Curated annotation (Swiss-Prot):
Expression by tissue: Expressed by the skin glands.
A GO CC term attached to the entry: extracellular region
GO molecular-function terms, A-Z: toxin activity
The protein's name in its UniProt record: Phyllokinin
Transmembrane segments: none
Chief location: secreted
C-alpha cells in the first residue's frame, strides 16, 4: 500500500 492509501478513497 502506498503512503497515501486511504480505505475511504478507492479509485
Amino acid at each position: 500500500r502506498p503512503p497515501g492509501f486511504s480505505p475511504f478513497r478507492i479509485y
